[in-house]
Regions:
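Short, Lys/Arg-enriched N-terminal segments with co-localized hydrophobic residues
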Residues: 3-12
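Active-site-adjacent pocket-lining segments in enzyme domains
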Residues: 14-20, 24, 37-47, 64-180
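Short N-terminal binding/cap micro-motifs at the start of the first secondary-structure element
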Residues: 24-29, 53
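Short glycine/proline-centered loop/turn elements that form peptide/ligand docking sites
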Residues: 30, 47-50
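Hydrophobic residues within alpha-helices
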Residues: 31-32, 100
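Short acidic-hydrophobic surface loop/beta-edge motif
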Residues: 52-56, 151-153
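A cross-family phosphate/adenosyl-ligand binding-site feature
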Residues: 55-57, 61-65
Length: 180
């Protein structure tokens, strides 16, 4: 019992932030939060607006843990970008989100449309292996990505996934990367 408790305590050092914008894909965000928290990781949802309540692409409203103005990303291991439309577009058009992603020295994970809509225009896929939701490959390629036809593409500091059906594997890849 004591060993398990210690293990969970140590895992909370793996700080992760999941951005939530109006129109986010609920499965991609909530599944990842659930998987990370079950693994003992410190996973926080961040609303990109001043309102903690964020409504997903399918009408599910979620109360985020904090807003962008309340978040301190300085010790983040992971920044996680769910997809969904118009969620991915809303993230891409938010200057604060783009700045945080570009300045982040840690790891980034993006799923569905977000590799193409959010990461590629920021230059974060340049020369990297990636996957995305079908139809967004050209955006990724424009950003310099080497496209892979796999559900989840995991490297040392970048994980991408192709959509809702890969959400569980996406979350597990983040956990495996952080905790082994």
């Amino acid at each position: 019992m004591g060993v398990r408790s210690q293990s969970i305590k140590e895992n909370t050092m793996c700080r992760s932030f999941i951005f939530l914008a109006e129109g986010f894909e609920e499965i991609e965000a909530i599944t990842v939060v659930d998987v990370l928290r079950r693994a003992g990781m410190d996973a926080k949802t961040v609303s990109i607006t001043s309102d903690l309540n964020v409504t997903g692409a399918h009408g599910v409203t979620v109360a985020a843990d904090m807003t962008m103005s309340e978040a301190d990303f300085s010790d983040a291991e992971w920044l996680i970008v769910p997809g969904g439309m118009p969620g991915a577009s809303n993230l891409a058009s938010d200057e604060a989100v783009c700045r945080v992603l570009k300045e982040h020295k840690g790891k980034i994970a993006a799923i569905c449309a977000s590799p193409g809509v959010v990461l590629a225009p920021l230059g974060l896929l340049e020369g990297r292996d990636a996957t995305c939701y079908p139809g967004f490959e050209e955006m990724c390629k424009k950003g310099g990505a080497q496209m892979r036809d796999v559900p989840v593409m995991a490297t040392r500091d970048l994980i991408t996934a192709n959509g809702p059906s890969a959400a569980m594997r996406f979350g597990l890849a983040i956990v495996a990367n952080s905790l082994g």
